[in-house]
Amino acid sequence: MTIEISAKTVKELRERTSAGMMDCKKALQECNGDFEKAVETLKQKGLVSAAKKAARVATEGIIESYIHMGGKLGILVELNCETDFVARRPEFQELAKNIAMQIAACPNVDYIKTSDIPNEIIQKEKETEMNKNDLDNKPTEIKEKIVEGRIQKRLKELSLMDQSYIRDSSILIEELIKENIAKLGENIQIRRFERFTLGEGLEKREDNFNEEVNKMLTK
């Protein structure tokens, strides 16, 4: 027996997920009217769709900027899609802005994904962990497993795609991208980003006030 689904519920699900009306109705019927289960069903189907699109070439897009802290921190990020049509859509531009804000909120993030992290960085992290005192009395096999777990955690701290989304901590940036791939129907990729901090790399002059006064008095 097919459960009766109201048009209002279908509309609410469509607004929540951006899926098509018929897809929303079908998901609600499959889940016996359970709204949250229907959301998860559509999300899973969307992620499958996103995975198929991820191999497609994305050469269009936008470069988005975000300035924070009264002009003391700036972010530039390049977000790519497949067509200029999608690049001009408000949803895509909002996504780019949110990603730029995410980068501003994550000062430890230096790479887009863990596979981008150079091997020398990984080896350095491994050496640091292997030499920690709390592992001195551990058997070699156990020690290596603990070190591997710590390294993976550290690498994720450096990776943008592994960060919890600042607007919804229940999802990662990787999941946010996949959801938007499903919503907009094109492959979307974060190609690169750059962080600018005011005065970074410059040595700030710190004058000794007493010395300055003495110099003035002796002139």
UniProtKB/Swiss-Prot annotation:
Record InterPro entries: EF-Ts_dimer_sf, Transl_elong_EFTs/EF1B, Transl_elong_EFTs/EF1B_dimer, Transl_elong_Ts_CS, UBA-like_sf
Subcellular location: Plastid, Chloroplast
Pfam families according to UniProt: EF_TS (PF00889)
Predominant location: plastid
GO cellular component: chloroplast; mitochondrion
Record GO terms (molecular function): translation elongation factor activity
Keywords: Chloroplast, Elongation factor, Plastid, Protein biosynthesis
PROSITE patterns linked to this entry: EF_TS_1 (PS01126), EF_TS_2 (PS01127)
SUPFAM superfamilies per UniProt: Elongation factor Ts (EF-Ts), dimerisation domain (SSF54713), UBA-like (SSF46934)
CDD domains to which the protein is assigned, alphabetical: UBA_EF-Ts
The keyword Protein biosynthesis is annotated on this UniProt entry: yes
Stated role: Associates with the EF-Tu.GDP complex and induces the exchange of GDP to GTP. It remains bound to the aminoacyl-tRNA.EF-Tu.GTP complex up to the GTP hydrolysis stage on the ribosome.
Family: Belongs to the EF-Ts family.
Protein name in the entry: Elongation factor Ts, chloroplastic
Encoding gene per record: tsf
